[in-house]
């Protein structure tokens, strides 16, 4: 591994210090971990860090029982058979310090560094942009036809900064969802599709799943890295009455179609397992494609920020910010 890639130990320390989950020194021996289940909901927060450092989420299973699922974000082996390559946690803690030293140090990009960037992982940014466009490396693409890799990195960095968060904080709940799926796959509870979990609780929010299934073959990365994709992951959360009322008041000028678009982009994510690695390592959420993991949607769905806090960061602009592409001439305000 490149010596300039952030060390796992250093990043793990940073993640541990910033993780907003409760820790109970006496809980490690009292909580039953999945695949063991309980008929009643365990009385712990979700997400939660046990005294031994294990990160867990609370899930309601299809059968009606409750599970405390270990979902620790960590580097791990690709030891689960999947096709010819295998799958597993891989390098979840890595950040590309070789290209983005400020990202590795602070969790956010320096725009000066981005302006000077000519290659990422040794690959020219023009080539990354070319293969990332629709109908190149993938049908949907990794960015829109008028976006480029630097404009997308800048645009999302501005969104995350305005939310008062970091890219590693954004990556963590995405990894928790992926690690939940890996646990299910390890237990042979995922086949052509997956419907064993009714919902996951997260910061007081209820995360539900739509269609989740493996795709045909593997999606290769647009960077020179080992990241690959083989799953379609679909999750969302429903707005509560207070949130509906808040948006109707703040965005009363939107017609029904645009309000529906705002709600959909705010509360629903369709993606794959490549994205948490991309967010952690590069601060890359994909451009405005079908598989984008928008930072605003992550913050809303997983309760990293309240709707009021999100609106305060983008007053009156949520529909525009969620739908506008990141071109060189059209980026969100800093």
Model-derived features: where do they sit?
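Bacterial N-terminal signal peptides
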Residues: 8-18
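Alpha-helical interaction/linker modules in multidomain eukaryotic proteins
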Residues: 23-334
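Bacterial N-terminal signal peptides that target proteins for export
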Residues: 1-9
């Amino acid at each position: 591994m490149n010596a300039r890639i952030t060390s796992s130990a250093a990043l793990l320390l940073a993640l541990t210090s910033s993780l907003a989950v409760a820790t109970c020194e006496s809980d490690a021996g009292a909580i039953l971990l999945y695949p063991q289940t309980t008929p009643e909901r365990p009385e712990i927060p979700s997400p939660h860090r046990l005294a031994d450092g294990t990160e867990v989420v609370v899930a309601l299973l299809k059968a009606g029982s409750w599970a405390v699922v270990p979902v620790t974000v960590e580097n791990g082996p690709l030891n689960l058979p999947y096709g010819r390559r295998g799958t597993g946690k891989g390098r979840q803690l890595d950040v590309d310090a070789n290209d983005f030293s400020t990202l590795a140090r602070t969790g956010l990009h320096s725009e000066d560094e981005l302006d000077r960037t000519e290659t990422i992982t040794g690959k020219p940014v023009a080539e990354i942009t070319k293969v990332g466009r629709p109908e190149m490396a993938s049908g949907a693409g990794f960015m829109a036809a008028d976006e480029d890799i630097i404009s997308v990195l800048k645009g999302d960095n501005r969104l995350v900064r305005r939310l008062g968060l970091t890219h590693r904080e954004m990556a963590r709940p995405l990894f928790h969802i992926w690690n939940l799926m890996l646990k299910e796959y390890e237990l042979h509870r995922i086949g052509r599709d997956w419907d064993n979990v009714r919902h996951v609780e997260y910061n007081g929010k209820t995360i539900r799943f739509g269609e989740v299934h493996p795709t045909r073959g593997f999606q290769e990365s647009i960077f020179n890295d080992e990241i690959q994709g083989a799953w379609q992951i679909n999750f969302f959360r429903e707005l509560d009455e207070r949130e509906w009322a808040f948006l109707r008041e703040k965005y009363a000028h939107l017609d029904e179609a645009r309000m529906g678009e705002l709600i959909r982009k705010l509360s629903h994510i369709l993606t794959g397992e490549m994205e948490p690695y991309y967010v952690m390592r590069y601060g890359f959420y994909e451009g405005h494609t079908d598989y984008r993991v928008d930072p605003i949607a992550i913050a809303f769905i997983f309760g990293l920020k309240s709707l009021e806090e999100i609106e305060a960061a983008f007053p009156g602009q949520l529909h525009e910010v969620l739908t506008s592409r990141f071109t060189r001439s059209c980026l969100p305000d800093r």
